[in-house]
């Protein structure tokens, strides 16, 4: 039976037609009732459909009869945006082959190369496919040439399809069956039933069944009711239910090596079920062939996967302080299916209680915040995103800083480091000049330029991550009229000169506006923030000083002039001294207000400053 199983994924850049191709495969195999079929079937979230992107990893089992034999095709669908590359790495652990899909109207894009690198690392069989050949602006032969050079294959080995109208999609199905190898054991077990191992590549939470782990069975088999253990967290559990995904839960009696399916664990603590962990069976003591005792811990976990580490942080606060508990519950529920999301409670005087959250990138922030607003009815204040910094203090202690509020006194810092990335930008050759100007503004290091073809090139640039999260993607798209794409990978931490920029309003520090910036950019950033605050803060009865400071030293200042009320306006005629007395009294009152008064910063002001 294993010989007729094909486990595969589809990897592509965002909007290259991956979800549409998945739809055609579901139709051809008769997996979905035509009456229930809808565009982008596997993209179940409203956000996925609206944005035209895949966010969450999906898996589905298909059956297809080819040349008189029945084949089981397990498709693990993957996202295409750079922020969700960790989802791609999870899916590729579970398959033997992948379709590399390229849009004929755009050619190879940055995320295509990144995903291809992941597939090669896993030694997967790669099926190259050019999509959207029906488009009037398709550059089919140019795309074929690029892909042929990239993979070092003959042009006639590359399939040309239209996922939209179904042209040649049947050839893709045949290629999956013919070219993708069947599952192989990762080792030769002593006992097929006992040496069971399964890789968790995703999970979701069910209030009745507990955590449901989506798994690829690597070795052995597992049945309902058997006792299992999660190796990384040493968590014991019992199989409450197991089965296939097609696309709903289809309960079965057992899963065997090569299968992709689900296991309901009954575990009520989602943090104990982590993607990349290995599930084994519980056996206190058993014997190996030599007769000596063997512990269950001698079974090694499956290699390769590393848990994703958030590198971009932002604070989330409810506009209505009474919604704090709703936000807390909502974040907890979202984390069940999103292991890269982390959060911890924090408190700021101006905003109240909220959470400092870790994300994979700026799109990840956007997706989470929109889900919180749509699914839980929350209106949020979201701080300016920042990256994680590393400092070494005078006692040689290493500290990771996720928020400006955690930044220590500058005099106690011995060394500072920030994360750097290797950035790849793919664009038409005639637009390289404009793109180089943008990249130079990042203050990184130019590495090289490689040409995919005479018309398109790849710029490789090393730069601090903080420059990437500041709308670089939008700047590159705008400069190239939408033709450029980018991808980046982490290089680790490098030395940096950083300072904490503080904002004072009427002499009072507003911690919510504090941020970590490069020392040589502090003045420009401080000036930008106080100028923006001057535009958005309402005038008071007294003049308000807006100041940017570093370590108590003021580096930029703006002033909101006092709101002028004519206290003598109701007087007419008579002695001018009466008016002067009233105005002098007003002047003294304003001076007292300025000394004792505190400016209430409206939520709108936070939103405006965080947005720039």
Where are these regions (language model features)?
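C-terminal effector modules of nucleic-acid-centric enzymes and ribosome-associated factors
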Residues: 269-281, 298-410, 416-603
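Residue-level signature of catalytic and energy-coupling elements of molecular machines
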Residues: 15, 21, 52, 75-77, ...
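Conserved catalytic-core segments of large NTP-driven translation/proteostasis enzymes
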Residues: 151-283, 298-315, 319, 344-349, ...
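Conserved nucleotide-binding/hydrolysis micro-motifs of P-loop NTPases
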Residues: 16, 28, 81-82, 105-108, ...
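Intrinsically disordered, low-complexity proline-rich regions
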Residues: 283-297
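Active-site phosphate-binding and catalytic loops of NTP-dependent enzymes
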Residues: 31-57, 84, 153-159, 177-198, ...
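P-loop NTPase switch module centered on the Walker A-proximal segment
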Residues: 1-108, 115, 203-206
């Amino acid at each position: 039976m294993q010989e007729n199983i094909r486990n595969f994924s589809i990897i592509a850049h965002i909007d290259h037609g991956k979800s549409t191709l998945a739809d055609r495969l579901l139709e051809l195999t008769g997996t979905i009732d035509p009456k229930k079929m809808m565009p982008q079937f596997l993209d179940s979230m409203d956000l996925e459909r609206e944005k035209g992107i895949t966010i969450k990893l999906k898996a589905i089992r298909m059956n297809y009869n080819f040349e008189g034999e029945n084949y089981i095709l397990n498709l693990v669908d993957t996202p295409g945006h750079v922020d969700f590359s960790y989802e791609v790495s999870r899916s590729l652990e579970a398959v033997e082959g992948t379709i590399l899909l390229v849009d004929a109207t755009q050619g190879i894009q940055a995320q295509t190369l990144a995903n291809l690198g992941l597939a090669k690392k896993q030694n997967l069989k790669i099926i190259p496919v050019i999509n959207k050949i029906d488009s009037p602006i398709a550059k089919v032969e140019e795309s074929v040439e690029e892909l042929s050079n990239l993979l070092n294959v003959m042009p006639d080995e590359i399939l040309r399809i239209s996922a939209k109208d179904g042209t040649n999609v049947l050839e893709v199905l045949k290629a999956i069956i013919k070219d993708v190898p069947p599952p192989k054991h990762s080792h030769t077990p002593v006992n097929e039933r006992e040496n069971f191992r399964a890789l968790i590549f995703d999970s979701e939470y069910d209030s009745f069944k507990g955590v449901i782990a989506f798994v690829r069975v690597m070795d052995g088999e597992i049945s309902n009711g058997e006792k299992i253990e999660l190796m990384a967290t040493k968590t014991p559990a019992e199989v409450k239910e197991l089965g296939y995904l097609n696309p709903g839960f289809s309960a079965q009696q057992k899963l065997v090596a090569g299968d992709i399916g689900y296991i309901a664990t009954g575990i009520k603590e989602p943090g104990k079920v982590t993607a990349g962990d290995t599930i084994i069976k519980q056996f206190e003591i058993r014997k190996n062939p030599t007769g000596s005792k063997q512990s269950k811990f001698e079974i090694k976990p499956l290699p390769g996967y590393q848990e994703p580490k958030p590198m971009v942080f932002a604070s989330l606060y409810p506009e209505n302080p009474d919604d704090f508990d709703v936000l807390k519950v909502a974040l907890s529920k979202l984390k069940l299916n999103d292991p890269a999301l982390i959060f911890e409670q924090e408190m700021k005087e101006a905003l109240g209680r909220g959470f400092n959250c870790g994300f994979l990138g700026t799109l990840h922030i956007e997706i989470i915040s929109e889900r919180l607003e749509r699914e839980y009815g929350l209106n949020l204040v979201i701080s300016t995103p920042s990256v994680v910094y590393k400092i070494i203090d005078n006692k040689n202690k290493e500290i990771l800083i996720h928020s400006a509020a955690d930044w220590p006194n500058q005099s106690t810092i011995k060394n500072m480091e920030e994360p750097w990335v290797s950035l790849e930008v793919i664009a038409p050759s005639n637009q390289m000049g404009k793109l180089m100007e943008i990249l130079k503004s990042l203050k990184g290091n130019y590495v090289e330029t490689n040409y995919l073809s005479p018309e398109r090139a790849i710029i490789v640039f090393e730069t601090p991550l903080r420059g990437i999260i500041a709308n670089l993607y939008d700047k590159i798209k705008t400069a190239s009229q939408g033709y450029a794409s980018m991808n980046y990978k982490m290089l680790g931490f490098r030395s940096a000169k950083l300072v904490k920029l503080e904002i004072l309003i009427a002499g009072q520090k507003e911690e919510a506006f504090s941020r970590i910036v490069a020392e040589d950019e502090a003045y420009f950033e401080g000036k930008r923030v106080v100028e923006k605050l001057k535009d958005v803060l309402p005038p008071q009865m007294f003049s308000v000083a807006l100041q940017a400071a570093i370590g108590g030293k003021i580096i930029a200042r703006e002033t909101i002039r006092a709101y002028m009320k004519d206290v003598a306006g109701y007087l007419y005629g008579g002695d001018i001294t009466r008016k002067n007395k009233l105005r002098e009294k007003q002047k003294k009152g304003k001076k007292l207000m300025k000394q004792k008064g505190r400016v209430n910063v409206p939520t709108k002001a936070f939103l405006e400053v965080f947005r720039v």
